[in-house]
């Protein structure tokens, strides 16, 4: 234990970081605006039923339906008391060509009194030392004399102190190609890929035997160089270095697929999955004020990754010539579907703030600008070769290559293409595989952490080729899938064993029993008899998707108040998923009711000052062991809200903090009450075990003892000096880090790597771990170990005259452990299905000159699915019950979006007899086939 006392006052500014002499603060100022920003008014006390242990509404539910849930986009300078009342505005000029030298811009159209108060260009940034944080690459603004890296790249910022001038000027310049000046033609920039991945697995004699070669056992393969911007893989050599040996097995597999045995069916297909916009309700925006007199910098932003901004913004500003002593950062509620995770937009907002000349500056995309600049889902070209045994109908091998278009900036492209390759196996056991991926740099708009993260593209393709294989083998599509399903204890294509029971077979079996599937032939005949001009099709698809990144981490602080309330503080951000509600409810398992006071996107963790150095994905084992001797070191400081990580990973930190408060606070208090009186009180005649404790309607009981109210327990806990607050930091590299802590003379090995405790009303104390047990760095090669399985049945009709697809009905079966808040899971299912339907049939962005980078795209051209596109009144879903009440909850936000894509394409194949390979499948594509 440390004697390191940490004082904490919620009524004062809270320092969260100091970088190069700049302090970064979170500022809970209790004004109208900051009530909103810091959730004092948005989040209501949970409407909790202690009998059925269910919550009636989201804790932000009333605010949502009453229009009181204010986003960063709604905040103006006048809302923040200490800011100047004048609100300035700015917009960016962006290129619409990326094959010619940029030579400047022409603002002659603004000569009628609409010229900006300030123009910022790359030369200003260079002079003042203002540049992107390293993650985002170069050229915050493109200098003259260079070819743009991508369509829509920003070249200048125009700042106005008057809204009317700003508004007229922006409209005056919009859609005019002569504003940006271009010089000589150069062609698009040619660059090496942003990232590559290759994983080879040659399994043993059985799925449970040791592998001959795999990423987990040996290593994934990296290129030895680049030639013409394509990877050069090592030369295959049996018995050579590990990567050479891996390439030897890859070469041998390729030879066999080219010259297969007679009893193999080999299918080769090329698939394409399009670029899409995540279409977040709130476009990117920022509002900031730089006060040169006090050298303070204020910024209001929506972000899925507030900790990333809190860490990177001070570094960016510290390198500039602007004198800044302190930053006040205000991350807000938002929605992004990945587009606000590590987005460059906050740094454009910071740039605008610096050049506001003392006036708060708001930089906010309209929807045209949002299409032109926000992070997109990667387009993928996928080349598949699948071998299936004609006799056994078992998969023999899969070779697949994936090319993801990362656009003009790297962002998360290296990990997206890796996740596509590692996720391609979907629900299937594949004994031999060679899966490679390349994330190319192109002139397209940036692609990044969009929902699906490569797996939507790859898993849909895998299930589409499996559907075609079943048809060619004249096998029942569900039976064929069940015959090839991965079972518990088998290995994935990286050679790792997934965690827990694999239940994809149960999900598929439920679909096989559904009338939509059992009666599909009759339903088809009946429909087509009644609708002469239409075709009817039924489709099935099942996938299981990982959740998490392989370096998940979070902070949670759970504490009791003397007034009988429970409070939670969490590093995770609420991005519309209901995470704020679910984490409040998680507290009820150990503390009897949900947290009444809830704070999210918390960036101040001075109560547990963990530090992180190095790259958790690329760290050597000896480096990790050396760094872990520091009891406050962790491989990863904090994760953004992404990768479906709240239900499982964020819950872990919350639950561990609540568990400690129960074990060292409420439980000893309960025992002290039950043991009061002569002879050991009411507890003495009974055998009382902590594991028998149960929360019932009126409080806590165990083994037939008196029910004690929570208030009574909290009162006794404070009287006894028991534990009233715990802060936990957790880390997961496809398994949880653990550490030894000595608490009350007892050494405990806990699944946390950082801990701070508060007893009664004392200050928090950092509890230094005695020893840490981090998952080996080799476990990075596992790729994934946590899965949720989802299957979707779909019925659709196709108009033979127009090619229009009408989705008639769909049914989805989900396996996601025990639910924290069932209504939130239902909402995720419905929303994910709509997204998948859009990807399969409607949503499409051209990648290059005709695409969103030209600044002309909006929802008049981009078809988001509407209610009549998604069978809104007929769709159904079911959720498999957990195996027991100990099953952890699983992430589902992304996986529910995926199988409906391939289910629809498979249903179209059932209706037309043609297996489409490119997404989306649009009416003209169908008409070509029907004609």
Task: Please place each PLM-identified region on the residue numbering.
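C-terminal catalytic domains of large/alpha subunits in multi-subunit enzymes
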Residues: 16, 34, 123, 319-326, ...
